[in-house]
Amino acid sequence: MSHPALTRLRALRYFAVMPSLPPPLSDWLLLEDSMTQRFEQQGKQVTVTLVNEGYIGRDALTDEAALLPDEPRYWLREIILNADGEPWLAGRTVAPESTLCGPELALQQLGQTPLGRYLFTSSTLTRDFIEIGRDAALWGRRSRLRLSGKPLLLTELFLPASPLY
């Protein structure tokens, strides 16, 4: 199954050099904390529409492969994050199979729970970088995060109804 927003997410082109962004845009794109929590601070009820979830091979990765360890299998989760039922963000998480051991096995059992609710309660979470991307008028970002030093890649596309615009 796919979703048009996830097609746009996969089409993001990332800036080699961080662009100069006006404060409202940079406040959203460079946020270090949970996007779920930020949406809830807007007074919205946040829900997840799960689009894809399961293992994929390395050949299914795009330029993501260069940002993750070389492994035969990766856990993929693609979602739409809704605020009061309106789609605000498309998200794609890719985690190498080796990341999914110990407490990080919970990444496979999130179901309708936003990823941020899990990630940002972990004291072992670190972020290596945030890359800013764009597809036509839509902005997005990609981060390599680590849980207990184990990597995962999170890509987010801000949809037209989100407060970023």
Curated annotation (Swiss-Prot):
Protein location: Cytoplasm
Keyword Lyase: yes
The EC number(s) this enzyme carries: 4.1.3.40
GO cellular component: cytosol
GO molecular-function term, one example from the UniProt record: chorismate lyase activity
UniProt entry keywords in alphabetical sequence: Cytoplasm, Lyase, Pyruvate, Ubiquinone biosynthesis
Catalytic activity: chorismate = 4-hydroxybenzoate + pyruvate
Metabolic or biological pathway, per its Swiss-Prot or TrEMBL entry: Cofactor biosynthesis; ubiquinone biosynthesis
Pfam families according to UniProt: Chor_lyase
GO process terms (BP): pyruvate biosynthetic process; ubiquinone biosynthetic process
Keyword Hydrolase: no
Main location per the UniProt record: cytoplasm
Top-level taxon of the source organism: Bacteria
Binding residue positions for substrate: 35, 77, 115, 156
Cross-referenced InterPro entries: Chorismate--pyruvate_lyase, Chorismate_lyase_/UTRA_dom_sf
Family: Belongs to the UbiC family.
Role noted for this protein: Removes the pyruvyl group from chorismate, with concomitant aromatization of the ring, to provide 4-hydroxybenzoate (4HB) for the ubiquinone pathway.
Subunit structure: Monomer.
Name under which the protein is recorded: Chorismate pyruvate-lyase
Native source species: Klebsiella pneumoniae subsp. pneumoniae (strain ATCC 700721 / MGH 78578)
